[in-house]
């Protein structure tokens, strides 16, 4: 497991907040609704990485960063999800992080979590299209549309999943829980460079994240400071090297 990274002089471990009180946590991750699909067999197909999180948390920026960091070493492609537009796919194409034919856009037409969990057909079709277009594809990043803290990927779509939150939502976000925060294979706390401006206490935020997630990893990052997301990129490399399919 990748050691948790931080940009601040605080300790990531432990249960204390550092501000003298604790918050009651009531969310039980075992109470989440069952996955309607179950784990998809790997076979010889590409590894599928889901990236989810609330609107504006930095999912597309992280996707772009991973493409920049991994594109020269891994045969990869991307599927984006938006409700009515192709905005995220267009952003990635304009940024030039991948050849344009390696980016597919899904327009969900409904709540984003529906297309990544309840009915994954459109996303699977997009993934299969990319695999047919690019034989030997090793990694497909599936970026969800912005949703709430309950949005998680079906294991029938994503072999492993990253959930992205950001400090602009306040340091209360991790302790609010929800399946995205508590069960994703990696939690990324993004935009840590803004913590002081928005009054977010990073020590509180990270301690709460670890308490909610147990042994599951947490990474803090600022893509302004580290545009290629080195810690998340290293974690993805570990998943690929291990051929990890969590829950299989």
From Swiss-Prot:
Keyword Nucleotide-binding: yes
InterPro entries found in the cross-reference section: CobW/HypB/UreG_nucleotide-bd (IPR003495), P-loop_NTPase (IPR027417), UreG (IPR004400)
GO MF annotation list: GTP binding; GTPase activity; nickel cation binding
Domain of life: Bacteria
Cellular localisation: Cytoplasm
Biological process, per Gene Ontology: urea catabolic process
Keywords, ordered alphabetically: Chaperone, Cytoplasm, GTP-binding, Nickel insertion, Nucleotide-binding
Similarity comment: Belongs to the SIMIBI class G3E GTPase family. UreG subfamily.
Function field: Facilitates the functional incorporation of the urease nickel metallocenter. This process requires GTP hydrolysis, probably effectuated by UreG.
Protein name: Urease accessory protein UreG 1
């Amino acid at each position: 497991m990748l050691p948790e990274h931080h940009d601040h002089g605080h300790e990531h471990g432990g249960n204390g907040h550092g501000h003298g009180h604790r918050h009651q946590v009531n969310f039980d991750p075992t109470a989440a609704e069952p996955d309607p699909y179950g784990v998809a067999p790997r076979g010889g197909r590409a590894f599928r990485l889901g990236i989810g999180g609330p609107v504006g948390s930095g999912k597309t920026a992280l996707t772009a960063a991973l493409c920049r960091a991994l594109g020269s070493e891994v045969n990869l492609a991307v599927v984006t999800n938006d409700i009515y537009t192709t905005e995220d796919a267009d952003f990635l194409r304009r940024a030039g992080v991948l050849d344009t034919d390696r980016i597919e856009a899904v327009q969900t037409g409904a709540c984003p979590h529906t297309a990544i969990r309840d009915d994954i057909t459109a996303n699977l079709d997009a993934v299969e299209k990319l695999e047919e277009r690019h034989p030997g594809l090793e990694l497909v990043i599936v970026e969800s549309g912005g949703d709430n803290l309950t949005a998680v990927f079906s294991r029938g779509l994503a072999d492993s999943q990253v959930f992205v939150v950001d400090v602009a939502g306040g340091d209360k976000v991790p302790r609010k829980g929800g399946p995205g925060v508590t069960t994703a294979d990696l939690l990324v706390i993004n935009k840590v460079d803004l913590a002081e401006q928005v009054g977010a206490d990073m020590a509180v935020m990270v301690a709460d994240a670890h308490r909610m997630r147990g042994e599951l990893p947490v990474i803090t990052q600022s893509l302004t400071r580290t545009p290629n997301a080195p810690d998340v990129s290293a974690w993805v490399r570990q998943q690929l090297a291990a051929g990890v399919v969590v829950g299989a």
